[in-house]
From Swiss-Prot:
Residues 25-46 form a propeptide. It comes from Scolopendra mutilans. InterPro entries: Snake_toxin-like_sf. Negative results: does not show insecticidal activity. It is found in: Secreted. Keywords: Calcium channel impairing toxin, Disulfide bond, Ion channel impairing toxin, Neurotoxin, Secreted, Signal, Toxin, Voltage-gated calcium channel impairing toxin. Contains 3 disulfide bonds. Expressed by the venom gland. Its main location: secreted. GO terms for molecular function: calcium channel regulator activity; toxin activity. This is Omega-scoloptoxin(05)-Ssm1a. Residues 1-24 form the signal peptide. GO terms for cellular component: extracellular region.
Length: 129
């Protein structure tokens, strides 16, 4: 009956991979002067986003401010109910630049920027079978 076990495992993994899980989005939250992290290179683990005044948090956001000579001055990471504009970076009156990014998977606003998705795990298990 090993083939029955493989079929059951395949069906379970397919269901888990294709059906989105119902849970609160988890984002890295490192925002404001009272943070214990500098947000540029160190940051806390992703946490569940609270409900915001505009509804649920559908996006993780990262906002970076650059000086006029191109140095990264400030980084903020937070939960957001709206996506960043399609033009990621805008010029500031000070000569610097403000770049905004948004994503909608757990921990996607970290320094690494990506975490493996369920599909990656699914493919890895299939390769082992």
């Amino acid at each position: 009956m090993p083939s029955l076990c493989i079929i059951a495992l395949f069906g379970t993994l397919t269901f888990y991979t294709l059906i989105p899980s119902i849970h609160t989005l988890k984002c890295v939250r490192c925002d404001g002067p009272m943070s214990n992290y500098d947000c540029k290179t160190t940051y806390p683990a992703a946490e569940e986003c609270p409900s915001l005044s505009g509804g649920s948090s559908n996006y993780c956001s990262k906002k970076e401010t650059f000086t006029s000579n191109g140095n990264l001055e400030q980084t903020r990471r937070y939960c957001n109910s709206v996506a960043a504009p399609s033009t990621a970076c805008t010029d500031l009156k000070t000569g610097g630049k403000l770049c905004e990014y948004s994503c909608n998977t757990d921990g996607c606003n970290s320094v690494a920027g990506m975490e493996p998705t369920r599909a990656v795990y699914f493919i890895a298990i299939l390769m082992l079978a």
